[in-house]
Amino acid sequence: MDNIEQRVKKIVAEQLGVAEAEIKNEASFVNDLGADSLDTVELVMALEDEFGMEIPDEEAEKITTVQQAIDYARANVKA
């Protein structure tokens, strides 16, 4: 597990109140981890803060799983 993946999972755990060990990469924020629409907005904001990036709304709507969040962060994080 790389640093970005660990950081994303830590944020997901903190935002959704789920144990990090229970977070699978393919898990859906809504269907598997119990997030509602407010949770997903807060999750996107936390990812933006953690990685120092801006996630446009149309992109944020496409991030529905842990792996998609990891992939987005990897592609857009400023090294």
Swiss-Prot record:
Coiled coil: none
Gene Ontology biological process: lipid A biosynthetic process
InterPro entries, per the entry: ACP, ACP-like_sf, PP-bd_ACP, Ppantetheine_attach_site
Positions of the Carrier domain: 2-77
Predominant location: cytoplasm
HAMAP family referenced in this protein's UniProt entry, alphabetically: Acyl_carrier
Name by which UniProt lists this protein: Acyl carrier protein
Organism annotation: Burkholderia multivorans (strain ATCC 17616 / 249)
The encoding gene: acpP
